[in-house]
């Protein structure tokens, strides 16, 4: 059982929801990424999604695009992202880390070389936005062979065939994109999410995390009533953008604690 799978199993036993924050490696500066990851854990993160910056992040809204631009300007590369995870692991061996990004940097490195390096850095999962499950069985197999969970996206427009494809090649959890659009979008249709999640869970058989459009503790709590996990990214990036460096970690921790407290008010298992 992977670290991600055991995390969800432990949370399910206690009826808690996973809190999965996202930040971009190298934003606002490479030397601040590990302190920010530690701040996320202090704020109640169960799993960390660490963005690999890319020059054309097609699924991301303006906030995360700006974070990628800053990280790239700071010289962040896929290899440096792996070095960052390795540094994080010197102080935290428990919290699962999922790399989230796009295919181009991985293909430039080479899939086999990437999964080997990710395993050595103690990465736990990888979510490649532009790898459709029906076209990347070899990548998913290589990831699993290296002990990494290949994680895939589902959306309101996903077909039952896409559900079956994800169930066949994915592991760890499902990232359900709750909106048609890009990250950071403002309006969530809670009723649509509540209707869709049980269908996904029944057909795919994995925990379901919901992201896109979660802006505050209240929206996180409402999503937590139906989902196994809440993924929140753009709002954290905004906190990073507005915070002075000497308050950066403290502000991120404080915001995440509000979300964690709200999630912990949700009672009972969603299964």
From Swiss-Prot:
EC number, UniProt record: 4.2.1.20
Pfam families: Trp_syntA
UniProt keyword terms in alphabetical order: Amino-acid biosynthesis, Aromatic amino acid biosynthesis, Lyase, Tryptophan biosynthesis
Catalytic activity: (1S,2R)-1-C-(indol-3-yl)glycerol 3-phosphate + L-serine = D-glyceraldehyde 3-phosphate + L-tryptophan + H2O
Gene Ontology molecular functions: tryptophan synthase activity
InterPro entries named in the record: Aldolase_TIM, RibuloseP-bd_barrel, Trp_synthase_alpha_AS, Trp_synthase_suA
One GO cellular component term: cytosol
Biochemical pathway: Amino-acid biosynthesis; L-tryptophan biosynthesis; L-tryptophan from chorismate: step 5/5
Active site per database record: 49, 60
PROSITE patterns from the UniProt entry: TRP_SYNTHASE_ALPHA
Top-level EC class: lyase
Alphabetical list of CDD domains matching this protein: Tryptophan_synthase_alpha
Role of this protein: The alpha subunit is responsible for the aldol cleavage of indoleglycerol phosphate to indole and glyceraldehyde 3-phosphate.
Self-association state and partner proteins as the record states: Tetramer of two alpha and two beta chains.
HAMAP family for this protein: Trp_synth_alpha (MF_00131)
Protein family membership: Belongs to the TrpA family.
Stated name of the protein: Tryptophan synthase alpha chain
């Amino acid at each position: 059982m992977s670290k991600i799978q055991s995390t969800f199993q432990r949370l399910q036993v206690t009826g808690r929801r996973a809190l999965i924050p996202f930040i971009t490696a190298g934003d606002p500066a490479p030397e601040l990424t590990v302190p920010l990851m530690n701040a996320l854990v202090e704020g109640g993160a169960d799993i960390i999604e660490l963005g690999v910056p890319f020059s054309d992040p097609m699924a991301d809204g303006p906030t995360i695009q700006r974070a990628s631009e800053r990280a790239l300007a700071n010289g962040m590369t896929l290899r440096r992202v792996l070095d960052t995870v390795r540094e994080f692991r010197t102080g935290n061996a428990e919290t699962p880390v999922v790399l989230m990004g796009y295919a181009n940097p991985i293909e430039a490195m080479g899939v086999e070389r990437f999964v080997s390096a990710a395993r050595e850095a103690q990465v736990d999962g990888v979510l490649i936005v532009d790898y459709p499950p029906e076209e990347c069985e070899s990548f998913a197999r290589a990831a699993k062979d290296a002990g990494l969970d290949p994680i895939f996206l589902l959306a309101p427009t996903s077909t039952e065939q896409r559900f079956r494809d994800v169930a066949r090649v994915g592991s760890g959890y499902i990232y359900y994109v709750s909106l048609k659009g890009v990250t950071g979008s403002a309006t969530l249709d809670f009723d649509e999410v509540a209707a869709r999640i049980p269908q996904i869970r029944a057909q795919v058989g994995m925990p379901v995390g919901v992201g896109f459009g979660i802006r505050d503790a209240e929206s996180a709590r409402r999503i937590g009533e139906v989902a196994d996990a809440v993924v929140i990214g753009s709002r954290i990036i905004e906190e990073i953008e507005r915070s002075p460096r000497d308050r950066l970690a403290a502000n991120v921790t404080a915001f995440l604690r509000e979300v964690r407290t709200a999630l912990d008010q949700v009672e009972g298992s969603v299964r």
